[in-house]
Amino acid sequence: RAYGETYGIPYVVTNCSNNYGQNQFPEKLVPLFINNIVEEKPLPVYGDGQYTRDWLYVVDHARAIDLVYHEGENGETYNIGGFNEWTNLDLIKVLCTQMDEKLGREKGSSEKLITYVKDRPGHDRRYAIDATKINKELGWAPSVTFEEGLSITIDWYLSNAKWLKN
C-alpha cells in the first residue's frame, strides 16, 4: 500500500483467513493431524479446543486473489474468508471421521487420539475475517465446502505421503 501510494503504482491489498489444502507445510494443523492419524499418534488440542478459526480452501483463495487482481478497485483492501468458522475441536472431529472412512478404520477410532494439552499463553480465541466486501462488491464466495475441501486435501496427503515426510 505504502509503495503504491508513494510511487503512484496501482495496487490492491488482500487479507485472508486460515488456508488449508494440498502442499501445506506439514507442521500446520490439517497436514499434521492427517499424518498423526495415519501413524496413530496423539492429536494435541490446546486448552478446551473451543478456539474458533475461519477456514478457506487454498484453491478458493487463489481464485479470489485472481478476481481481486482483475476486478478489484485500485487502492482497496479485500478480506478473503471462507464464511466457515469451526472450533478446533469440531474441525478435528470432522477430520477424524473422514480419515477413519478413508483408512477403513472403525468409526470413532481416530477421535481416541485427541489429547488435550496446556494452552499457549495469549492464544487468540478467534481468528476470523469479515469477507462481506469481496462478496458484495465482486460477487465472490467460496466454491468448495469445508467438507469437500478437506476430503480433497486428505486424498492428496494420503497419495503424497512421501512429500509429507520430507
Positions of predicted regions on the chain:
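Active-site Tyr-X1-5-Lys
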Residues: R1-V12, I37-V38
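C-terminal substrate-binding subdomain of Rossmann-fold SDR/epimerase-dehydratase oxidoreductases
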Residues: P31, N35-N166
